[in-house]
Amino acid sequence: HERLVGSEMCIRDSPGVKALNHAQLKLKPGTVHALMGENGAGKSTLMKCMFGIYHMDEGKVIYEGQEVQIKGPLDALNRGIAMVHQELQPIPERSIGENIYVGRYPTKKYGPVTVIDHDKMYEDAAKVLKEVHLNYDPHAKLGTLSVSQMQLVEIAKAVSADCKVLILDEPTSSLTAAEVEALFTIVDELRAKGVSIVYISHKMDEILRISDEVTIMRDGQYIGTWEAKELTTDMIITKMVGRELSNLYPPRSNTPGAVSYTHLTLPTTSRV
């Protein structure tokens, strides 16, 4: 069965122009589903609909068998849908723990007043950091980390929401080779726990290595879904661009053109 289904999804940029044109995506539990397409194909737009950042003009989202209206990112997180964006939005002057639970701080009663339960927040943050193999102090300022380390904290934030769906938008763009391997370990563990993972990337080696299924989009439209093991790099590129690679890179002709020049020399000048 599918865990999350988006169907006939349309967003109009302007009258007559659709950023999404009857796009669709079906996610199964415990799978890594690659979403591919050229820049501007609509991949991130589709995912931002699933995460409640954008609202559709047409279409529907079915989650756990029920049609839902995702009102915004916090609503998505509360439902168990998490997204790690390509463009990070960290709060560097706040602690790692605060960044993980921003907008979802645990609370406690202090007399008649409800306050943030900092002890529980840092205790829970330490657990989730350990769960994703990050040896960071949750009390440390986020700004002390590198950009790639901040990206891994974003993944910890998604895991902290006990997500059933995790959307990763170009997750390795700023990671080192060692950090990519660490990310893949996390992805494998989440898949084994039944999490549905959307993986957006232009890196073919990553897609073919980690994905179970691949959906390809072009010009805001759904092109098709295939099992990753059925695909090669050339097949993916052909489906992304809509024509054979041989048409993209036709063989060069060595036949001389109508005009050719040989043995040209330039006149010399001498100083007087």
What are these language model-derived features?
Residues 1, 253-256:
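A short beta-turn/loop motif at secondary-structure boundaries
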